[in-house]
Amino acid sequence: MAIVGTILFAFYSVAIAAAWFFFGQNQTILAIAIVGSVVLVGVQYKVGKWMALRSVGAEDMDEQEFPRIHRRVESLSRDMGIKKPTLKVANMGVPNAFAVGRKGNGTVVVSRELIDILEHEELDGVLAHELSHIANRDVVTMQLGQGIASIVGIVAQYIVLFSGDNDLADFFLAIVVGNLVQFLVTLFVLAISRYREYVADADARRAIGTGEPLARALEKISQGNEQAAQQQRQRTSRGRGRRQRGQRNDDGLDQQVSALCISSPDTSVLQKLVSTHPPTEKRIQRLRS
């Protein structure tokens, strides 16, 4: 995590240094850049957490209805040295789970579909994986990375715009360059996200003593997502699968939530490049190695 933070800070530092160089040593501009970046990341973090929970209709997980899950999360949290996160349950339409928030104020959401298909040990592996994300501050790190990507893109736009003749051609060039730079930084952030998934898998394996339960859980989740995607395609072919609000993946989850979940359905080469998760088969192979 220290290396990841250092690299993200390097991107941010380069952006601020470039703004300082091109716009002059103006204390006001520098102050606005720093304050604006902090506010941007903070807003993204707060709004992102709220939207993720709201989009799946997450509700507090009743301890009387799910006593074992509460006990296991409390035990695993204690072993990982973190405060027990808030537990929520949701009807996602697919078997999955995700974590939001930071260490000391985290939330783990588990779909009812996941609870229905997993054995106790398999569910323990999933819970340990999500707790690892909270313990390692992965969600906060990814939000920070996305915020820095936006800042770097904005700085690149203004550099192109103000270093030219400030005409219409420069305006469109600035947009293209800014989006391209932001995309390139985002690719790096996504690579970090895929790496952190492997780390969370390894932490979960250590927490429960074996990687086999989580490997089986990932297989079942992958199968469940594929079945849901197939049903969605069938509904679409019959004309009943028109998208309502926002852009959604074939599994029916908002893309923002899908990025947080333990498993992602991305399969094509391009999807793998811009995916937040590594291929499920590789994760299973590592867990069983």
Curated annotation (Swiss-Prot):
EC id: 3.4.24.-
Cofactor: Zn(2+)
Segments of skewed composition (Basic residues): 235-246
Domain of life per record: Archaea
GO cellular component: plasma membrane
Catalytic machinery residues: 130
Any one of the GO BP annotations: proteolysis
Enzyme class: hydrolase
Signal peptide: none
Entry's cofactor comment: Binds 1 zinc ion per subunit.
Region (Disordered) residue spans: 222-250
Keywords noted in UniProt: Cell membrane, Hydrolase, Membrane, Metal-binding, Metalloprotease, Protease, Transmembrane, Transmembrane helix, Zinc
Gene Ontology MF terms in the entry: metalloendopeptidase activity; zinc ion binding
Membrane topology: Multi-pass membrane protein
Positions of Zn(2+) binding: 129, 133, 197
InterPro entries linked: HtpX_protease, Pept_M48_protease_HtpX, Peptidase_M48
A UniProt-annotated Pfam family: Peptidase_M48
Subcellular location(s) per record: Cell membrane
Chain ranges passing through the membrane: 3-23, 28-48, 144-164, 172-192
Protein family membership: Belongs to the peptidase M48B family.
Protein name: Protease HtpX homolog
